[in-house]
Amino acid sequence: MRARGLFRGATMDAEHRVDGQDGTAGAGPEGGSQAPSGQDGGQGGAVSAELHASGGPSGPQGEHRREDASPESGGEHRAEGTPPAEGSEQRAEGTPAAEGSEQRAEGKPSEQGVAQRAEDTPSEQGEPQNAGSAQGQGGEPPVASGDTQGEGERPHNAGGEAPGSADASGSEGSKDQAGSQEGGLQAEGTTSQGQAEPPAKDASHAQGEHQAVSDSHGQDGSESGGRSVANEEARAEQSPSDGEARVTPGLDERPQGAFWTGEADGDKSGDSDEASREDVLPEPEQRLSGRVTTVLLPLEKLQDESAFKLRPEGDVSGLATDIARLGQLFPVDVRPAGEDRYQLVCGFRRVAALRFLKRDAVQARIHLRLSDEDALVMSLAEAIHATPVGPEVLEAKRDELEAQGRLSAAVRDMLEKALATEDTLAPEGVEEEIDADELAQEVAQRLGAINQDLSLLADVFAALDESRKAELLMQLRYSSELVTYLEGL
């Protein structure tokens, strides 16, 4: 009795759909997309789906179903006068209805995690389509009908098909006046355009893994599932990836400045290291920096040569007195010259004064890598810039210190010695009286000697250099002019 009642309900449902009338509570308006509803209690669509799934006979007026539908034909069913659509497939191939389809036919909502797909959406590679793409022209979203079950749902049937997956949709371009699109629900793993492949469970999971988020939230269509996927993608974009390092600002930054000489970071290229070294300012005396050592050098290790001596040492008694009283104030400059031998570059008078005092060591700056050119420049600079202090400056300083009360006995003695040295070096004054007759006699004798020398040069005058000739002629002209002048007196 129950089967007959279901058969009659399916027949009436098919007749009303062919005539374009609103026979069931779940039927869509004219031109709208129609899908069997599992939430609103539309028994007509659900009973029709159960009838097709159980292999019952087709309706007398509008529906024709092939019980021996092969996978190639896809088990299509359509109303009379309606051309077949690409997606209007019927997945039931004589499979008896499961208990889940009866429960959904009675108006019970599908379980959580059910996914919808419209058969009229082509899928070339067998990828499952979301039910949100199957909304009809009428703007009513289709309701999930329990095509595929998520985690915790009822298992698939032995045939690998989802229970109650009946095709209740027509073609979008149907010539019927009803004009309604009935979107059939297709199990995962099936392909459209009339090629029905048995959707295995493994194939469904292999090809539809990317719909896990959408299937877990898919009770009412693709709206809530789309929002969930969008939220997941937004959080994924905002959160840093696993390969990105979370760097705290300020901890990994290297110090800035012109004198930074530390190593650069590990993720920096060789070009940035060279740029940072170029920014470093050169240190003063870069040629000599790090290559000079000040030591107390034995005098016996100095070579007795004067390659860089510019003038003789002269009298070093005063310098020796100052060194004996004050010590050596300034070290000398040397450079290595063989094994345990050194060459003196600057400080010859200081070394002579130390030897005068019978000392055995001298304070010296050893220039480890000093070229001949640099050594010569150093010796010249010391001699040129050692400007002697004039007596006027020394006297002014003595008067200034005496006025300030700072002129001690040692300072006075040093200044007096310096002034005495200047007086001894001054030329003697001309105080001797000269006799003119004696001077004239002396000049006459010298002129006679010069005339004899000129007579000797007359024989070789033509062979002389032009510059020598000009110089002799200039002196003779001066003498001739002087003779004319003296004769006129």
Swiss-Prot record:
Pfam families: ParBc. Residues 1-289 are annotated as: Disordered. Its cofactor is Mg(2+). InterPro entries: Chromosome_partition/occlusion (IPR050336), ParB/Sulfiredoxin_dom (IPR003115), ParB/Sulfiredoxin_sf (IPR036086). GO terms for cellular component: chromosome; cytoplasm. Disruption phenotype: Mislocalization of ParA and of ParB, nucleoids are more compact, bactofilin patches are mislocalized. Synthetically lethal with smc or double scpAB deletions. GO terms for molecular function: metal ion binding; nucleotide binding. Residues 295-384 are annotated as: ParB/Srx domain. Residues 123-134, 213-222 have a biased composition (Polar residues). The N-terminal disordered domain is not required for interaction with BacO, BacP or ParA. In the isolated C-terminus structure CTP binds betweens helices H2 and H3 of one subunit and H4 of the other, stabilizing the domain structure and allowing interaction with ParA. The ParB/Srx domain binds CTP and probably ParA; CTP binding is required for ParA interaction. The flexible C-terminus (residues 426-489) is required for interaction with BacP but not with ParA. Homodimer. Interacts with BacO and BacP. In situ probably interacts with monomeric and dimeric ParA, in vitro interacts with ParA in the presence of ATP, and with ParA in E.coli. Belongs to the ParB family. PadC subfamily. A non-essential component of the chromosome segregation machinery. An adapter protein that recruits monomeric ParA to the bactofilin scaffold. Cooperates with the bactofilin BacNOP complex to correctly position the ParABS chromosome partitioning machinery. May also play a role in bactofilin complex assembly. Upon expression in E.coli associates with DNA and causes nucleoid condensation. CTP-binding stabilizes the dimeric form and allows ParA binding; it is not clear if this protein can hydrolyze CTP. This is ParBC domain-containing protein. The gene is padC.
